[in-house]
């Protein structure tokens, strides 16, 4: 499978003031949209049926995947980023019953971090997404080689 090369996928405008006014839950809500658009972007090629796109995207936007990706990001995060992650994690409500609460909270913290970075530091967001993309591509390549 060929995926699109890394490139800025959104017109990002920094707005630190807006980010400071948002609750951790609101940052997570926004970060969820940022992350899903990023995942959709990297799986856009080669052309496939919509159902195939959907299955690929869902596999990567699930709470379990997001929690795993946060584990990958953790050592690369600044103290301020980890604070945003913790605030998002701690603000998480109980998620769906199919997902353990710890995983759901970690995924919510991950989303809050992405939402915060989108609003405050677009270049850092691109760096974080590039790191995630490397891991996602490696996972996809490993799965295809089976």
From Swiss-Prot:
GO molecular function terms noted in the UniProt entry: ribonuclease III activity; rRNA binding
InterPro entries assigned to the protein according to its UniProt record, in alphabetical order: Mini3_fam (IPR008226), RNase_III_dom (IPR000999), RNase_III_sf (IPR036389)
Compartments it resides in: Cytoplasm
Pfam family name, one: Ribonuclease_3
EC number annotated for this UniProt entry: 3.1.26.-
CDD domains (alphabetical): RIBOc
Record-annotated active site: 32
Cellular component annotations (GO), alphabetically ordered: cytoplasm
GO biological process, one term: rRNA processing
Keyword terms of this UniProt record: Cytoplasm, Endonuclease, Hydrolase, Magnesium, Nuclease, Ribosome biogenesis, RNA-binding, rRNA processing, rRNA-binding
Assembly and oligomerization: Homodimer.
Task of the protein: Involved in correct processing of both the 5' and 3' ends of 23S rRNA precursor. Processes 30S rRNA precursor transcript even if ribonuclease 3 (Rnc) is inactivated; Rnc processes 30S rRNA into smaller rRNA precursors.
Family: Belongs to the MrnC RNase family.
Name of the protein in its database record: Mini-ribonuclease 3
Gene that encodes it: mrnC
């Amino acid at each position: 499978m060929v995926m699109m090369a890394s490139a800025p996928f959104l017109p990002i405008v920094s707005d630190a003031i807006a980010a400071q006014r948002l609750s951790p839950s609101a940052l997570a809500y926004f970060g969820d949209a940022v992350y899903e658009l990023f995942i959709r972007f990297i799986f856009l090629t080669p052309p496939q049926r919509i159902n195939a796109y959907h299955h690929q995207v869902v596999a990567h936007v699930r709470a379990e995947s997001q929690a795993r990706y946060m584990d990958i990001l953790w050592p690369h995060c600044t103290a301020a980023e980890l604070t945003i992650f913790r605030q998002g994690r701690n603000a998480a409500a109980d998620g769906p019953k199919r997902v353990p609460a710890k995983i759901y909270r970690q995924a919510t913290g991950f989303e809050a971090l992405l939402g915060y970075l989108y609003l405050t530091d677009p270049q850092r967001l691109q760096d974080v997404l590039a790191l995630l993309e490397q891991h996602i591509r490696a996972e996809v390549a490993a799965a295809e080689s089976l």
